[in-house]
């Protein structure tokens, strides 16, 4: 704990700290966030902009075999330069590590649950529920905006589209719609779901 305090005590006006990872203004840091209760770690990149601004969180790999989103986020995190960034970006590269490793399409192998259906999760639950709780409490709670990347797996061909949430009140619906309009996609669909990663974050 004392070493962690020393690492993250730079005193800068803009700082992004998650678990044992700390990025100060103009820095990009990578590391791991341990899931509540142990068992797995989540790979993160923190990008702390040189200028102050809101915090965006982007996640991928909620479904382990949806590799396109994982690749896209990996490329984005490499390309973003914190010195040219206003605000912060939290990149959760793989939300479902064992499914990603073992090519399991829809579920967390250890408990057979669909991670995208157990949010906001449980602190003392099964692995899926603890992953969801960790993402909710340790990552989403720090974000002003959130994008969850999904894709077809290797056997699917999916038209690019974006869902935006309209179930969490007028203000969030308006912000979500504006984010969807900024996406370069022809298909945009409103959603009243409440249990997925992004839907739960809106509540």
Language-model features: locations:
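Intrinsic-disorder-associated, low-complexity terminal segments enriched in Asp/Asn/His/Tyr and depleted
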Residues: 1-4
